Amino acid sequence: MDWLFIVKLAAAAPDGGSSAKRHLLELAETEPRREWCLSRWRRMAAGDRLWIYVASPVREVAAVAEIEGEPFEAAGNPRQPWRVRATLSPAATRRLHNDPVPLHLLANRHPQGVTRVKDADLALLLRRAGL
């Protein structure tokens, strides 16, 4: 299954670009295995993908990660009590960094939080990521 996952990182880089996109690319290349926070439990499984979209300054899908297993409970943050481990794909994230998918091209133009990728959008995401 494929999921859209919102990240809200730094708004803009000094050159007007997205520092969030750069940060995601750096993470993919240096520390790709991460724990991602969830506000609710989702029926995720090993092999599912997180398509990570940056909320600002532009709304676009800029990275992809493969989920390692089901979400698990994590103490410490009552607003986001769940975590899921996923590994960013350096090659696919690099391709998305260079040619991101703007949300206005997707059927779900206003995703809220973590939602499933619509079937109509998957081919575009896979193509842009080189998968």
Predicted regions located by residue number:
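Compositionally biased, charged N-terminal/linker segments
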Residues: M1-A46, V117-L124, R128-L131
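Short beta-strand or tight-loop elements
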Residues: A46-D48, A63
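Short, charged beta-turn/beta-strand-edge "cap" motif at the junction between a beta-strand
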Residues: V54-R59
